């Protein structure tokens, strides 16, 4: 009954994203963070 994580939000694994895809992106501080696509 877990709610999926929306696009652009931090994610631990792809399976938790509404889109089913969680990839590394560079944030405004230049750090690499995983976010839902």
Swiss-Prot record:
It holds the Pfam family Omega-toxin. Expressed by the venom gland. GO terms for biological process: defense response. It is found in: Secreted. The record marks 10, 27, 35 as: Critical for insecticidal activity. Keywords: Calcium channel impairing toxin, Disulfide bond, Ion channel impairing toxin, Knottin, Neurotoxin, Secreted, Toxin, Voltage-gated calcium channel impairing toxin. Its main location: secreted. GO terms for molecular function: calcium channel inhibitor activity; toxin activity. SUPFAM superfamilies: omega toxin-like. Disulfide bonds join 4-18, 11-22, 17-36. PROSITE patterns: OMEGA_ACTX_1 (PS60016). One of its GO terms (cellular component) is extracellular region. The presence of a 'disulfide through disulfide knot' structurally defines this protein as a knottin. Inhibits insect, but not mammalian, voltage-gated calcium channels (Cav). This is Omega-hexatoxin-Hv1f. It comes from Hadronyche versuta.
């Amino acid at each position: 009954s877990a709610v999926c994580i929306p696009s652009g939000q931090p994610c631990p694994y792809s399976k938790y994203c509404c889109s089913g895809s969680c990839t590394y992106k560079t944030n405004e501080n230049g750090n690499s963070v995983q976010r839902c696509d």
